[in-house]
Amino acid sequence: MSKPNRAARAYNQDHVPRKYTPGRRRISIYWTWSYPWECNCDVAAMDNRFSTWTEVRRVAWPAFEGRDWDQANFLQGIDGTLELFHRSTIPFQDLAGEATGHPVVVFQRVDQAGYRLPIDERILADTDTLMVFGLDHLPSAQDALPEEIAAIREWLKREGTCLLIGPHHDVGFTDDLKQRQMEYLHHRDPLVPRQQRFSLYARALMKAFDVPVVNKWGLRPAVIKGTKDLQPLTTFRDLDKLGLLKDVTTFNFHPHLPHYELTTDDAKKISLLACQPVDLEAPHPFTQAGNNEFNALLWMPPRAQRAGDIVLADLTIFTELFGASESLCKFWRNIAKM
């Protein structure tokens, strides 16, 4: 379960601030969920909940049939699924830590023990890149507080800061049951309910900071025929002033990724850096409307009093849930060293 010679894991202690080092970013991850709310969802509910670990094991069988994943060693409820997300970011944390010389610190809005941590100076003081991972289900009502918005706004006045917002998918946002079923048959993930809506907190940040984006759908990315390899991204490298796409051709596979729909034509306000081709094998309202790729990476340069950058990328790009290719690792390194 743990890698040999890995540092001892610590739990249930206060964060020790990292010292500023010129040219080396201090990266923080902020999971927007209430861990208890998500884990206490009724497992008989059809929509807007995570799978239990038992459900994951059944669907993915026999991938998780080793000793590491049994009842004696791993949580079998929804909590096990959330812990898999935590574990899946460790490769990114390791790579970014090596690249920057600073450990990547992970925070949760409400953690396993019920401690609530809104975004404030305790998080922001020693953070240069804040990665907001929007994996809160909408019914959990994790809205950003006015004082959080004010704290982030003040932080973004600091030179060299970057707010990375990662809203996840919005599947089945209609009352039309036939459309929900069409979406399901498109992404083909039996662990995703017919309605699964995420990222109220991230949406609140996007509204507060005038980010002209809406996270929509859960789209299956296209692969190269006869392989499991993703089709290359469509990139706009002339707009990539931060070098985020240097040596990057693909991100990673995830069966239901959000489309970051733009609500403005102002190219000076926000730049679309990369699009991902969509799997066209099964119909979807998005492709039926004439679209064959979705927006995957966007950037807002500093503007007015905001000295920091804003980047939008799905949170699952920073996990190894479906593997971590050489191209993806290069993207992680670019994010760490931007």
Language model features with spans:
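Short, surface-exposed patches at the edges or C-terminal ends of soluble domains, predominantly
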Residues: S2-M338
